[in-house]
């Protein structure tokens, strides 16, 4: 039985990375440094732009985050691909929250637009995931649109984020 809460702390997210939150067969979040959120502040099976589920999470920004030291020297900015990965992470987390089992894998995205950036002077990144469809058959898959905001300003959008849960990834 999955512990379906509306919010999760950093410790909860770290437990997910160790395979402890959604059970031995549930999907895991990555461990730091690839874990791209500090907390999940809202999870719901309704709501969002399509009323089919909604997730909101946050990442606290500080100049000491690992990517600012290498991307780019003298011009630090969070790589856009990390924001995209965070959205995929949250789609997979939601599938586990619903009780889905398997190893999460990003399957694609329809379109991504970057209209801003995350600098070391920012305070907070917010991720918003709006679910469009959940497939729960032999393959468990989530389809969603996502938004990334920095200090409450929209900077990335992604349409048709796809994540699947697989029992066996050896032939993937």
Swiss-Prot record:
Listed GO molecular functions? Answer: (3R)-hydroxyacyl-[acyl-carrier-protein] dehydratase activity; trans-2-decenoyl-acyl-carrier-protein isomerase activity
A Pfam match? FabA
Q: Which reaction is this enzyme known to catalyze?
A: a (3R)-hydroxyacyl-[ACP] = a (2E)-enoyl-[ACP] + H2O; (3R)-hydroxydecanoyl-[ACP] = (2E)-decenoyl-[ACP] + H2O; (2E)-decenoyl-[ACP] = (3Z)-decenoyl-[ACP]
One GO CC term, this protein: cytoplasm
Q: In which pathway does it act?
A: Lipid metabolism; fatty acid biosynthesis
Would the keyword Lipid biosynthesis turn up in this protein's UniProt record? yes
- Give EC number(s), comma-separated: 4.2.1.59, 5.3.3.14
* UniProt keyword Isomerase, yes or no: yes
Q: What is its main location?
A: cytoplasm
SUPFAM superfamilies per UniProt = Thioesterase/thiol ester dehydrase-isomerase
GO biological process, alphabetically ordered: unsaturated fatty acid biosynthetic process
Listed A to Z, the keywords are: Cytoplasm, Fatty acid biosynthesis, Fatty acid metabolism, Isomerase, Lipid biosynthesis, Lipid metabolism, Lyase
Family annotation (InterPro entries): FabA (IPR010083), FabA_FabZ (IPR013114), HotDog_dom_sf (IPR029069)
Location(s), subcellular = Cytoplasm
Q: Which CDD domains match?
A: FabA
Task: Please give the function described in this protein's UniProt entry.
Answer: Necessary for the introduction of cis unsaturation into fatty acids. Catalyzes the dehydration of (3R)-3-hydroxydecanoyl-ACP to E-(2)-decenoyl-ACP and then its isomerization to Z-(3)-decenoyl-ACP. Can catalyze the dehydratase reaction for beta-hydroxyacyl-ACPs with saturated chain lengths up to 16:0, being most active on intermediate chain length.
Q: Which HAMAP family match?
A: FabA
Membership in a protein family: Belongs to the thioester dehydratase family. FabA subfamily.
What is the protein's quaternary organization? Homodimer.
Q: What is this protein called?
A: 3-hydroxydecanoyl-[acyl-carrier-protein] dehydratase
Whose protein is this, by species?
Klebsiella pneumoniae (strain 342)
Its lineage reads: Bacteria, Pseudomonadati, Pseudomonadota, Gammaproteobacteria, Enterobacterales
This protein's gene is called fabA
